[in-house]
Amino acid sequence: MAIISEDDFRHTSNSTYRTASSSLRADQEALLEKLLDRPPPSLQRPEDRFNGTYIIFFSLGIGGLLPWNFFVTAQEYWIFKLSNCSSPAAGEEPKDSDILNYFESYLAVASTVPSVLCLALNFLLVNRVPIRVRVLASLTVMLAIFIVMTVLVKVDTSSWTHSFFTITITCMAILSGTSTIFNSSVFGMTGSFPMRNSQALISGGAMGGTLSAVASLVDLAVASDVTDSTLAFFLTADIFLALCIGLYLLLPRLDYARYYMKPVWPTVFSGEEQLPQDSPSPTSVAPGSSDPQTPPLGPILKKTTGLGFCIIYLFFITSLIFPAICTNIESLSKGSGSPWSTKFFVPLTTFLLYNFADLCGRQVTAWIQVPGPRSKALPGLALLRTCFVPLFVFCNYQPRGHLHTVLFQSDVYPVLFTSLLGLSNGYLSTLALIYGPKIVPRELAEATGVVMTFYMGLGLVLGSACSALLVHLI
């Protein structure tokens, strides 16, 4: 191993960089395909006893998205709370009627804009603010926001509905931003761990969506008071966020996690020695960077361009279809009046089925990682998912203003298509996300994880924006 003078290094809060006049050669980087499966002889890698680290990352994945999912799932609650703005008394002029009519649009803006801004902010904070501070601060703010929303559930807001709307949108914006910082920070941290831990975090996010869909179905079946069910939703989120704080504080106490969270030795990639995938994140030499506090964005973008395209396009197609198109596909036997074809059709065939299929696709990557990060099959499969757009459009989407043809005359088709949409999204997006931090020098793993989540956010924003146009064309 090459010896480097301390004078050649620049230290930051999370990583150690050395100024270099030229970037590292491709064959000198720790590429995923060439990584060894065992640690160097001088280090003994602890075992993940009882899969404790895996379970913690899985739980953090749930906690990162469960509050947001519950926030969005409580549609009936928002209608109940905001209906006073849109239902004036007899003889009165409608006041602020757009609050209820366009509430979901306001919610989407309050969700996406802060997410993109906070992703960029988090990249700049990677080496300025310790990850422990970022994670705990974001979790604490998320918990505080949900405590406020939980308290307001049983408060009569009929006399100040407009103020309640303002508070709700503000809380959603803060929640979305802090959730983004939390998720991208933890995902960046898993870049220094073996891939199964990144997979656990991503699968946990899908489990959060599945749990919220199940909760929504239970609420429909029980038909309880809307405020009671929402109170149960929000209290569950409060408890889980508090649990996530405890789990994150527990993480460094596990030998296995501590092994990967602490740098062990300064090193340079020499081309003759490759650090194994299962070795801890070392204090390494980074490609040239003029600011030791800011990770070099250029090399990260260069190495992750292909994977970034896959992530953006995968989530673009997914958010183009789900939920805007999926939720408007009706059962062909809707006229029968059965609960399956009316009350439960969309919650079952759209939300629960998609989230469960997405979870299954993500979980499969724990055992199978094909195709690889350099394979042309990965972007090819991402592009192939474009076929889902016409498949869903020609199901029984209603109402139809321009395209009146319904080709798929059975309820089996939307069930099949939604399952394939979720499976392909879960499997392919997880592969692309977990590959990213593994194809760059190890000291850039955390920053690369943040960039990968930015790709995901960009795809979601583009898809959501274009879904409105697609709905208009139908």
UniProtKB/Swiss-Prot annotation:
The modification Phosphoserine is found at residues 21, 23. The gene is SLC29A3. A motif (Dileucine internalization motif) lies at residues 31-32. Uniporter that mediates the facilitative transport of nucleoside across lysosomal and mitochondrial membranes. Functions as a non-electrogenic Na(+)-independent transporter. Substrate transport is pH-dependent and enhanced under acidic condition, probably reflecting the location of the transporter in acidic intracellular compartments. Proton is not a cotransporting ion but most likely change the ionization state of the transporter which dictates transport-permissible/impermissible conformation for nucleoside translocation. Residues 276-292 have a biased composition (Polar residues). Residues 272-294 are annotated as: Disordered. PANTHER family: EQUILIBRATIVE NUCLEOSIDE TRANSPORTER, EQUILIBRATIVE NUCLEOSIDE TRANSPORTER 3. The keyword Transmembrane applies. This is Equilibrative nucleoside transporter 3.
